Amino acid sequence: GFYIKEKIKGDKALNQKQTETDVIIIGGGQAALSTAYFLKRKKIPFIILDDQNQAGGAWLHAWNSLRLFSPNSWSSLPGWVMPNTEQTYPTKKEVIEYLQQYEQRYHFPIIRPVYVDHVKSEGEVLSVHAGEQTWRAKAVISATGTWSHPYIPSYPGQENFKGLQLHSAHYQNAELFKDKHVMIVGGGNSGAQILAEV
């Protein structure tokens, strides 16, 4: 199999034209870190390619007042319980800090920022391409989430609507909606939390 002979860190790895390992995880959020934890436990060589400049995944782009809707102990990643927070439901800042500490605690080999262009099958291996850089692995795990490609449904007469239509992925705070009539579409956690705020 392929093995990384030394720990990969930022610029050093980015300067390498090609890196080979057993598994490449694309994405650096909670799913990627959880996967990395179990790969490390099984001593399976891997690297994480994350397009963000720092740890935190989609939480880096969430609205300012976002909180977890469950207590920290229920929202922990494998191997390390999220430390107690000031309030029962951790804030965006507290979750990002936890994800940063989690990465550091387990010394995951993360290269960032790397925007993956495409993945191609090359017989027994997969090649992962980011610009002129290429990595090869036996397996590739997509942990990119949905934040970067939010879905906004179309509806009849949409082109005539004069108001603002905004996906929760682009919501920051309630200021834009002050003294306006607002309709929230969707009953998920994002919709419920934003509704309570606007």
Language-model-derived ranges and their functions:
Residues 57-96:
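Glycine-rich active-site loop/strand segments that organize a redox cofactor
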Residues 91-148:
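Feature captures the FAD/FMN-dependent oxidoreductase FAD-binding
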Residues 52:
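Residues in the short beta-alpha loop(s) of Rossmann-like NAD(P)-binding domains
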Residues 21, 44, 138-139, 179-182:
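Nucleotide donor/acceptor-binding cores
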Residues 20-48, 192-198:
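N-terminal Rossmann-like FAD-binding beta1-loop-alpha1 element of flavoenzymes
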Residues 85, 91-94, 144-198:
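Glycine-rich dinucleotide-binding loop and its adjacent helix/turn
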Residues 35, 58, 121, 151-153, ...:
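Short glycine-/acidic-enriched loop or helix-start segments at secondary-structure transitions
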